[in-house]
Structure formats: structure tokens, C-alpha cells
UniProtKB/Swiss-Prot annotation:
GO molecular function ontology, one term from the record: DNA binding
Localization per record: Cytoplasm
Primary residence: cytoplasm
Species name: Burkholderia cenocepacia (strain HI2424)
SMART domains: GIYc (SM00465), HhH1 (SM00278)
GO BP: nucleotide-excision repair; SOS response
GO CC annotation, single: cytoplasm
Keywords: Cytoplasm, DNA damage, DNA excision, DNA repair, Excision nuclease, SOS response
Functional description taken from the UniProt entry: The UvrABC repair system catalyzes the recognition and processing of DNA lesions. UvrC both incises the 5' and 3' sides of the lesion. The N-terminal half is responsible for the 3' incision and the C-terminal half is responsible for the 5' incision.
Family affiliation: Belongs to the UvrC family.
Entry protein name: UvrABC system protein C
Domain GIY-YIG: 22-100
């Protein structure tokens, strides 16, 4: 890796370019603040990076980026495939401004069959292991739960936790309604249950005909042995399976595992719709909306995009494969790329495939709406997956229907997003006008809202939610545990949370001002500018005059502008639409009509603050009630406490256990079991 230049040394690209090798690798551009502008890969670092500084006809946006480059770092790799993998990891980690970015959904849901002797069927998110069986990934939690319901109806596998399974003495309701064979009480043998598990696994893998054929043979065998009750049970199972297959006839195809990727660009935004087929069943889809698209695409339009060797789309039913472009030097490739320049959709699809599949499971077939990634990317995906990954560009039959449906869903999702963005921007403008907030760019308007939640003074929590860039910013939400107050004193709770929230910001502004004053700069101007950059423009308080008065006192003590404080007082009967806005700077209360766009935004932010506060309060209260007694036990640490809860299913089960049962738990001796029993009784 090249070492960054010292900050005092002026940026001289010629010296850096002269030192670059003719080798594959990854390059990174930084600005004067150290922020990453762009991450790219190259089969020849010297030629690739030099092209940014030697070409004379750069687009204005590319030229602007080049003028901002203050530092270049490169990393040499052994191959272009390694460079591609490193580039993808760096884009995810650094989020450069000029790269297309997708939200990193690290955890897709799976359907899990555990390694228990009576395997449990469960919804699962997280990293997979080799001990259990995993089916998926699925595009949504709904798709997993629907599959679980189908398997319950047909194969009657258990879904209960192991701690519940180990402690049952009679069948649960699921057994009574025909959704579980009750292995917990020995209603089915381990061998018969294993057969059901095997059939369920084959069903998920798309081998439904095999399952149906074996069930039919089993039914005839029972009938020949005059075991008519068993034959009737198998017949009912076949009937349930046939019903499921009939209901899903439109979805089921000959393909086993296929992903369908459709890209649509409209109104300055792009949507990638990912539909998943697993075991021949269409499981639904999910829409993705990348950011930084415009900035990234200017690089491609200017002939400075990624060095892509288009992949050949292959399929026996495809009309024709996509033409490939042979390897060319960087300076010669520009004209070829200009003649067959990738569309916006193709560039976005390149980024999506790299960021979505590298490091994740890849199906054997990707049906795509545009010729996407380079052959290097496909080879890397195939190597990672352990099987060949094929791209289908012009599908036929069922695959064409799937792609058409994915494209339509992408258009609908994009239209919905654009409509919501327009509506949200209109609400922001309405609120700004109502509060006489003047700004040329309303996207910079930052609103913070506070709410207090507790139950009869127990587990008091305050929440702070943030509205910025015309939407709620959940990553900036914060919860505050309120302590040292009289239980139920909402005023004291509001005083504490506002002080804790803004006192640090005021201190940071004061410290910056002190530094500037020491350097002979106007410290007061610095303090005001620093405070403005840290503080919100509007602070909403969920409450009336009393809460607003407390907020006014806190802001006055901190030297903050009280005009940004707005209370949201509930109307008569606490009905939505009858709220009154209360101000801390002496303005008269303001009542907005039910149809007011400004009130709709205020209610949206206030309701989100309430939801965030109450969920945190409930979790805190539940944790205190369920674990406090176990945490107080002498000789019982976190691991032993976890084993007790897993063995007995909860605090109630631990309390009801005998000394002998407690001693049967790993890590708990008979003497400790007696001690635990005495402390709980």
C-alpha cells in the first residue's frame, strides 16, 4: 500500500503516478479532510489512475472530483478478482461519495431445521453453521413464516423452543389442531419423525414429486397390511400436500434456486428488485434503492467507470448471449466503452451484484434485466459458491414471466418511493412555513422530538428521535434511562433528558470558541457557528405548557435559543388532529386543522418518539421483572443463569424445580442446587 502524503506536503500527482506499478489493485481518492471520494479497481493501476490526470475532456463533475483529490492510496493485489473483492469490501466500509452504494442487509432470514434428535423448525437470522440445516435465504420474514405454516400443515414438525420441549407433560394446542405430532410426549417415534423431517427438507429443495410418490407407496403398504388408520393418516398428508401444490401452481417452476434481478431508473432514482425462487417456489421480492447513483455514473459517462469486461449471459433457452469485449489497455478501452456504454441500470446492477452476493450465498442462476457484471465477478462468485453461477439476460418461459413481474414490481416500488418523497417534502415545507422557519434547503432542517414513558413510575425512559433530510433517521435515535427522580415525575424526567442531551453540545461549542480566541479569532462567532452545526433547528416536546416551561428553563440555563422549542399538547379527548402547538418564546398557542400537512408531520414525529420510548420502557420493565430474582442468587453467574433458563424455560420453571432437577443442570452441584432452592423459597 502506498503511504499517505504528509498533510503539510502539497499534492503532486506526477510524483505519485510515477511510482505506481503496472499491476492489478485498488485505488482510493481522499480529499483534504480525509474523507474518501472514490474507490476503484484496476487491472493496471498505473494506467487507470493516470487516466484521471492526463485526459483533457473530463465532464464537469469528474473534473470537480479530481480537483478535490488531496491524497491517493493504492493496494496491489495478486489478481483482478482479488481487487474486485477488496474494492467491494472497501466500498461497504468507507461509503465513498462517488461510488454507488446499497444498504448493507447483512442478515437475510432463513428457515432452520435444528440438529436436535427431534429437529425444530424455526425462523432464523444470522450466520449459518454446519451443525443445523438452513433453507433460503428468503426475501422477507413473511416468506419464511408462510413456509413454516405450510410445513406445519403437511408434515407437522415442531416449532417450540427446546426449553419448552424438554418440560412438556402433555401435548400443546398445535397437536390438537393437527399442526404438530407431539414428539415432546412421545406421540411419534424418533424414526417416524425423522421421515417427516426428510420429506420437509426435500419439499423445500423442490423435490415435491419424490415426496408425493413415497407417500403414495407408504399409504398402499399400510393398506396391504390392513393398517387402515395409518393409511388414512398418510392419505390426509398427501391431500394436504396436493392442496399446497395446487395453490402454488402458478409459482412452481422447473428451476430449483434462481434469483431474478430487475433494475428500473426513473425520476432521478433507481430501484433494484430482487425476487427469489427457492425449491421451485417463488418466495416474493424485495426492493433496494441505491444512493450516490448520479455522482458514480458521471465517472462512467466520462469514460472513467470501472474497467468492465461484460459477462456472457448463458442459458439454453436464451435468445442470444451478450457480446463480450476483449481485454484492452485503459487508454484504448474508453472508445469501446463509449460505443457500448453501460446504461444507468447496468452500472447499478454491477454494484448490486458485487455488494449483495460477495460473502453471501449465491444461487446457480441469476436472471437479469440488463447485461451486468464482468466475467471476473462471475468467476469470483462461482468460486465462492462452489458451483457455476450463470447469468440469463433474455429468459424464456417461466423465467420470462418472473423477470416481467420483477420489473413491474420495481416500477411500482419506485413510483411509491417518489410519491412518498414528494409528500414528505411537502409536509416539511408546510411545517417550516407554519413555524416561520426560513431556509433555502429544507433537507437540512433537523427536528428532534422527546417523549417520556413509564408505568406508574417504574422503568422511566426518555426517547429522542430525529427527523432530517425529509425522513426519520433511526440510526440517530437515542434512549435515556432516567434515574434519581421521584417516580412518575415527568417534569423532572424532561429536565434531565434535555440537560443530558444538549449540555455536551454547548460545552463542545464553548471549547471550540476558546481555541479560536487563543488563536486571535472571534470566539463568539465560532461558538454560535459550532452550536448551530450541532443543535437541531426545531425541538418538539410531547406535552403542554408545563413540559414546555421546563424545556424553556433548561434552554435558558444553557444559553440556547428558546424559539426552537415547540410543545405538542393533546387535544380534547386526546384525539389525533386536535393537537395544539405551544411555544416557549411567548407566541400564542397554535391550533392546526386535521388536514394540515404541518400537523401530519408533527404527529408522525411525535408518534415515532412515543413508539420508541414505550418499546424501550417495556423491554426494560420485562427484563427487570424476569431476571432480577435470578441475578440476585449467590453463586449463579451469567452462564449458569442462562443454563437454568434454557433448561426450565423461564423464572417460573426454575422456581418450580426440585433440588434434584436443579442439580441435573450442567455446572450446578447438589450443594449449589440446595442453596438456589432455599433462596427461591
Amino acid at each position: 500500500m502506498t503511504s499517505p502524503e504528509a498533510s503539510a506536503t502539497p499534492f503532486e500527482p506526477k510524483k505519485i503516478l510515477a511510482q505506481l506499478p503496472h499491476m492489478p489493485g485498488v485505488y482510493r481518492y481522499y480529499d483534504t479532510t480525509g474523507a474518501v471520494l472514490y474507490v476503484g479497481k484496476a487491472r493496471d493501476l498505473k494506467k487507470r489512475v493516470s487516466s484521471y490526470f492526463t485526459k483533457t475532456q473530463l465532464s464537469p463533475r469528474i473534473a470537480m472530483m479530481v480537483t478535490r483529490i488531496a491524497r491517493i492510496e493504492t493496494t496491489v493485489t495478486r489478481s483482478e478478482a482479488e481487487a474486485l473483492l477488496l474494492e467491494n469490501n472497501l466500498i461497504k466500509a468507507l461509503a465513498p461519495r462517488y461510488n454507488i452504494l446499497f444498504r448493507d442487509d447483512k442478515s437475510y432470514p432463513y428457515l432452520k431445521l435444528t440438529a436436535h434428535r427431534f429437529p425444530r423448525m424455526a425462523y432464523y437470522r444470522g450466520s449459518v453453521d454446519k451443525q443445523n440445516q438452513y433453507f433460503g435465504p428468503f426475501p422477507s420474514a413473511w416468506a419464511v413464516r408462510e413456509s413454516i405454516q405450510i410445513l406445519q400443515r403437511v408434515f407437522q414438525l415442531r416449532t417450540c423452543e427446546d426449553s419448552v420441549f424438554n418440560n412438556r407433560t402433555r401435548p400443546c394446542l398445535l397437536h390438537q389442531i393437527g399442526r404438530c405430532t407431539a414428539p415432546c410426549v412421545g406421540a411419534i417415534s424418533e424414526e417416524d419423525y425423522a421421515v417427516d423431517v426428510s420429506n420437509a427438507a426435500r419439499f423445500l429443495l423442490g423435490r415435491q414429486s419424490e415426496v408425493m410418490k413415497e407417500l403414495e407407496q407408504k399409504m398402499h403398504a399400510f393398506a396391504a397390511e390392513l393398517k387402515f388408520e395409518q393409511a388414512a393418516a398418510v392419505r390426509n398428508q398427501m391431500s394436504s400436500l396436493a392442496t399446497v401444490l395446487h395453490q402454488q401452481a402458478i409459482e412452481v417452476g422447473s428451476d430449483s434456486d434462481v434469483d431474478i434481478l430487475a433494475v428500473v431508473a426513473q425520476g432521478g432514482r433507481v430501484c433494484v428488485n430482487l425476487a427469489m425462487v427457492r425449491g421451485g417456489r417463488h418466495l416474493g421480492d424485495k426492493a433496494y434503492f441505491p444512493t450516490h447513483v448520479e455522482s458514480a455514473l458521471t465517472l462512467a459517462e466520462g469514460g472513467l467507470g470501472e474497467e468492465v469486461e461484460p459477462a456472457e449471459a448463458v442459458d439454453a433457452t436464451a435468445d442470444a448471449p451478450v457480446d463480450t469485449v476483449p481485454d484492452q489497455p485503459a487508454e484504448e478501452a474508453g472508445s469501446a466503452r463509449g460505443a457500448a456504454a453501460a446504461s444507468v441500470e447496468a452500472e447499478v446492477l454491477d454494484a448490486f451484484i458485487a455488494q449483495h452476493y460477495l460473502g453471501n450465498r449465491v444461487p446457480p442462476v441469476l436472471v437479469v434485466s440488463h447485461a451486468p457484471a464482468s466475467r471476473d465477478l462471475l468467476e469470483l462468485l462461482s468460486e465462492q459458491a462452489g458451483h457455476k453461477v450463470s447469468l440469463v439476460r433474455q429468459p424464456q418461459g417461466q423465467r420470462r414471466a418472473w423477470l416481467s413481474m420483477a420489473e413491474q414490481n420495481a416500477r411500482l416500488a419506485l413510483a411509491r418511493l417518489l410519491s412518498e418523497q414528494g409528500s414528505q417534502q411537502a409536509r416539511t415545507r408546510a411545517l417550516a412555513d407554519t413555524l416561520s422557519y426560513d431556509s433555502d434547503d429544507l433537507a437540512t432542517l433537523r427536528i428532534e422530538c422527546f417523549d417520556i414513558s413509564h408505568t406508574m413510575g417504574e422503568a422511566t425512559q426518555a426517547s429522542c428521535v430525529v427527523y432530517h433530510h425529509h425522513k426519520m433517521q433511526s440510526s440517530e435515535y437515542r434512549r435515556y434511562n432516567i434515574t434519581g427522580i421521584t417516580p412518575g415525575d415527568d417534569y423532572a424526567a424532561m429536565r434531565q433528558v434535555l440537560t443530558r442531551r444538549y449540555e455536551k453540545m454547548v460545552e463542545q461549542a464553548a471549547q471550540a470558541a476558546a481555541v479560536d480566541e487563543a488563536a486571535g479569532i472571534d470566539g463568539e462567532s465560532t461558538r454560535q457557528a459550532e452550536a448551530s452545526s450541532l443543535l437541531p433547528n426545531i425541538v418538539l416536546i410531547d406535552g403542554g405548557k408545563g413540559q414546555v416551561e421546563i424545556a424553556r428553563q433548561v434552554f435558558t440555563e444553557l444559553g440556547l435559543d428558546t424559539s426552537m422549542l415547540v410543545g405538542v399538547a393533546k387535544g380534547e379527548g386526546r384525539k389525533v388532529g386536535l393537537e395544539t402547538l405551544v411555544f416557549a418564546d411567548g407566541r400564542a398557542p397554535l391550533e392546526l386543522g386535521k388536514e394540515s400537512a404541518a400537523l401530519m408531520l408533527v404527529a408522525q414525529i411525535r408518534d415515532e418518539a412515543h413508539r420508541f420510548a414505550i418499546t424501550g420502557m417495556r423491554a426494560k420493565r420485562a427484563k427487570a421483572r424476569q431476571t432480577s430474582r435470578l441475578e440476585e442468587l449467590e453463586g449463579v453467574g451469567a452462564k449458569r443463569r442462562q443454563r437454568l433458563l434454557a433448561r426450565f424455560g423461564g423464572l417460573r420453571g426454575v422456581v418450580a424445580a426440585s433440588v434434584e432437577e436443579l442439580a441435573s443442570v450442567e455446572g450446578i452441584s447438589h450443594a449449589l442446587a440446595e442453596q438456589i432452592y432455599k433462596q427461591l423459597h
